Amino acid sequence: MDYEEILFGLQPILNASSIKDVPMNDVYLGSYLAVMDQLAVSLREPSNRDIVGKTGLLLNLVRVLEQALDICFHDTSISINDKIAFYEISSEVIRCIANAIIDNDDNREILLDSGGKKLLNYYIGGVLQLDEISSDKSEDSLVDKLQMRSVVLLRNFCIGNLKYTENLAPFIRGPLFVLLKTTQYSYLSSPEKVVLGSDLLNDILKVNYSNVQISDLFFLSQYIKKISSNVQNKELQAMEDGAVEAYSNTETQKFAGQGNQEYIEKEEEDDEEDVNCELLLNLSTCLETIVAKDETINFTNEEQLVLSMQKNLILSLVCLESKTFNNKLIVMRRLISCAGNISANLTNSNKREQSLCIETIKSSASSYALAAALMILCNSVASKSDAVALLKLISLSELIQVGSLLQDPLQYQGFLDLLRKLLNLENTMWLDIKDLFTLFQIMRRCHEQTKYYNNLRSLLTNLLNKTLTVLPSSKIHNSISSDPTIISFIAEHGTLTSCIAMDKLLVSKKALPKEAITSLWDSIFKFQNLGQAEQLSISDLFHITKTVGIYLKDSSVTADVNPIENILFKDYIQKLTLILETILSFKENKDKGSESCFNNGKFIAGIILNIVKNTKCLTPEEQNLEALAKSFF
């Protein structure tokens, strides 16, 4: 960089007490802009950034920029030509400052110490909200350039520094929303500005997500719907995150590297599809961040906006489902997360959305749209009366069949919890065997998905336990008889689930293969529930002792008539002994849980004594069990 030459060319601007005193005819203006362009290009070199910081040039540029923007914003006496000239100067100075602070903390500190906080918060924020320079909008390209470079300046200032981002966030978030709103219907005419602006908004929302207006949430959903319709069915290469360098009149910017490496100026054609995919990813992330993190959002009296938001999200999912595009899985999951978090808000009853969701379920084959609809419906059921009312609008059979279309693990969340809320003793009695078979198949497929997505485990376990609890024992027996793999699926779900299944099968008094019984006992005596490493609770011990008691009382299921043939004596006597020893220690406990377990243990002990009383030859383990049983009396 020929620093002296650049400094000489900028002397009229730098030495003037006010930039208003600087001649601004075309010749002079062209000269200033040319010198600043040279300076901006030279600041690609890190050593030149150090020079402008240490020599005070950066400090002077900040002063000039603040003066120029202050005149543009507040001086009503200047002509439109002078105003345009000052905006031209401001644009180039913004570009120079943006490039000077790339990967240079010293220059960032200079910017802050020289009054840069007001510059960034107020003046640059004002540029982002600039709608026009002249009433005939003849300077739209200048506005676009100013805003693009302002976004770059803010991004390069914040990148990699959480403290700076937190300080700027409250002042910049609003202007960024305004910037995006003005481009909603023309974003393809200024793609870099919109993509980088939405990316910066992502960073801002990570640290400042509270108190966003409901209307802004609706705007994001609208924008997402519009972009979704523009995404083409085409595989695209992902762009990487990075800082940016402000661009010149004839150059656009693309990523130069990875991580925190900066944009450099390159000549490259805009790729409309890259823009759509990048913007879709950024805006879906923005919306998800807000609705997932801000627990203070209040949708009271905003029912129509909420309905419109959910409709926009569902329509976006329907539109995107059949398309192949970059980051599709991430985007689709974020959109159903948005719908789910909006519906899960405690101030949202979700009643007005029921018709939308039912229509989606009955007419759409989009698995992600169906997943969103199921989540919303699930959150609309808060009581038994809600469940009854919903089942008047859509049948269990229809909901179960929808579940067979789900594939992505995240799609199952609403389905699992909704079915758990709706199933009861009455409606399962009339459940068609075909629907029941489908339900077990869905749950088994979902169980396989829990290997990759642990959050589904508790939801699936709750539904499986509810299903086994409310189904008639004959239907459970028939289902297992027609599909023996159901037993292995149940057994894999742990002690409590296996206890519930065993209780129902024992009540049915129909014979089952010994292999099925063994699978359930193996699971019960693992003393562990799916996804839980800790020891069983009092509640689990109660269920185990209840199941053991039922089995010993009526062991005709496998024709066990004496200790030699009884499977608990033959294969699980050590486990049975351990349980009774544990429960015997509850003898003096006064809490209801311990008392219930002890009563079950006493019942088991009585049956054991009855079984062994006529047996002449007991093994040492059976003798120990007999002595333990007597201790209960």
Swiss-Prot record:
GO terms for molecular function: guanyl-nucleotide exchange factor activity. It comes from Saccharomyces cerevisiae (strain ATCC 204508 / S288c). It is found in: Nucleus; Cytoplasm. Disruption phenotype: Cell polarity defects; delocalized actin patches and abnormal budding. Cell lysis at high temperature. Probably acts as a GEF (guanine nucleotide exchange factor) for the Rho family of small GTP-binding proteins (G proteins) that stimulates the dissociation of GDP to enable subsequent binding of GTP. May also chaperone the processing and/or trafficking of small GTPases independently of GEF activity. Involved in the control of polarized cell growth via CDC42-mediated signaling. Involved in the control of cell-wall organization via RHO1-mediated signaling. May also function via RHO2 and RHO4. This is GTPase-GDP dissociation stimulator BEM4. The keyword Cytoplasm applies. InterPro entries: RAP1GDS1. Interacts with CDC42; the interaction is direct. Interacts with RHO1; the interaction is direct. Interacts with RHO2. Interacts with RHO4. Interacts with CDC11. Keywords: Cytoplasm, Guanine-nucleotide releasing factor, Nucleus, Pheromone response. One of its GO terms (cellular component) is nucleus. Present with 6330 molecules/cell in log phase SD medium. GO terms for biological process: establishment of cell polarity; regulation of cell wall organization or biogenesis; response to pheromone; Rho protein signal transduction.
